[in-house]
């Protein structure tokens, strides 16, 4: 089963009939329009390419305009691709709504996390700080040693150090689907998802469900 592209609206909470408060993220999933269908013969794999939303005409490049015109769909804010499983069939120009998730219990949500800029090891990796006093006058939030000795004589790849924090592709898995509102094109999932309000999200049926 393919996924859909949506937009993060924000967080709120809803109440069950028993009065239990559930924190939810509201995802607006406008109709995903099929712009291209890839097959084994021409592309070597089966996939469907979709767009959603709208883009100003003066922001659409000529190659993009031709691509959307060939598919007979309105120019969207981007292009996304989903692999097709055996038996799944879609046609160019077809519109896919949030009702795709009507019978789905859990989803995986992928987005770009909020950028935090250049961060030290305490903020970025939750390192412990060193002594505030007792002879320590300069090294309160420094990471400490980053290596060993003449052997190996280098800093290992992947060593946790200061650097850019956030602004990376993140997937949160197995979030409960609380509600599917087809009339307003809304999908409510339990808990938080990556990214700032208004960012694009890719929602897929959970792989671990």
Curated annotation (Swiss-Prot):
Residues the record lists as N5-methylglutamine modifications: 150
Post-translational modification: Methylated by PrmB.
Top-level taxon: Bacteria
GO cellular component annotations of the record: cytosolic large ribosomal subunit
UniProt xrefs under Gene3D superfamilies: 3.30.160.810, Translation factors
UniProt keyword Kinase, yes or no: no
SUPFAM superfamilies reported in the protein's UniProt record: Translation proteins
UniProt KW Membrane keyword: no
UniProt keywords, alphabetically: Methylation, Ribonucleoprotein, Ribosomal protein, RNA-binding, rRNA-binding
Record-level Gene Ontology MF annotations: rRNA binding; structural constituent of ribosome
Entry's Gene Ontology BP terms: translation
Subunit and interaction comment: Part of the 50S ribosomal subunit. Forms a cluster with proteins L14 and L19.
Family, similarity comment: Belongs to the universal ribosomal protein uL3 family.
Purpose: One of the primary rRNA binding proteins, it binds directly near the 3'-end of the 23S rRNA, where it nucleates assembly of the 50S subunit.
Protein name: Large ribosomal subunit protein uL3
Source lineage: Bacteria, Pseudomonadati, Pseudomonadota, Gammaproteobacteria, Enterobacterales
């Amino acid at each position: 089963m393919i996924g859909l592209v949506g937009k993060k609206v924000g967080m709120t909470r809803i109440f069950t009939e028993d009065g239990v408060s559930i924190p939810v993220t509201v995802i607006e999933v406008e109709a995903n329009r099929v712009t291209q269908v890839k097959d084994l013969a021409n592309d070597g794999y089966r996939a469907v390419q979709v767009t959603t939303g709208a883009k100003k005409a003066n922001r659409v490049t000529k190659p993009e305009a031709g691509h959307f015109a060939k598919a007979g769909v309105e120019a969207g804010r981007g292009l996304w691709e989903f692999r097709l499983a055996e038996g799944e069939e879609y046609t160019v120009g077809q519109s896919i709504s949030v009702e795709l998730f009507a019978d789905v219990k859990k989803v995986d949500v992928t987005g770009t996390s909020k950028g935090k800029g250049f961060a030290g090891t305490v903020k970025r990796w939750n390192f412990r700080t060193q002594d505030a006093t007792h002879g320590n006058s300069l090294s309160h939030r420094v990471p400490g040693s980053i290596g060993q000795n003449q052997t190996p004589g280098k800093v290992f790849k992947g060593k946790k150090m200061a650097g850019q924090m956030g602004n990376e592709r993140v997937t949160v898995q197995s979030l409960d689907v609380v509600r599917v509102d087809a009339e307003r094109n809304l999908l409510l999932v339990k808990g938080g998802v990556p990214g700032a309000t208004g960012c694009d999200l890719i929602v897929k049926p959970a792989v671990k469900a």
